[in-house]
Amino acid sequence: MKYALRNTWTCQRGKSPEAMTGFKAVAENYRDMGVPTRLYVDISGDMDVIVMELEIDSLDEYFKDQRAFYAGMDDATKGLIDGLNGNTSSGKRILYEIIEF
């Protein structure tokens, strides 16, 4: 079973370009780990929205890796995450099961 994990962030007004720089680095890291990753930005609807979608094979592995990542962050990574958090005002996560046909 595969899953699509869609994280959606609403950026502070005018901070989307700055936030996107950080999200591109995060997405590249996921891709380097072999995780299919896409980034989206709004065209219609709510403004200043960035979406990162990951395709994952195991929920257990994903959440285990997330806990390990946050527990072992170096100072540069902490700075990147702090920058992302500083440029966003809210976020949500939606998990989908991918249906193969």
Annotated model-derived regions:
Residues 45-48:
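Short acidic/glycine-enriched loop/turn segments that link adjacent beta-strands
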Residues 41-43:
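Short, low-complexity Ser/Thr-rich regulatory SLiMs
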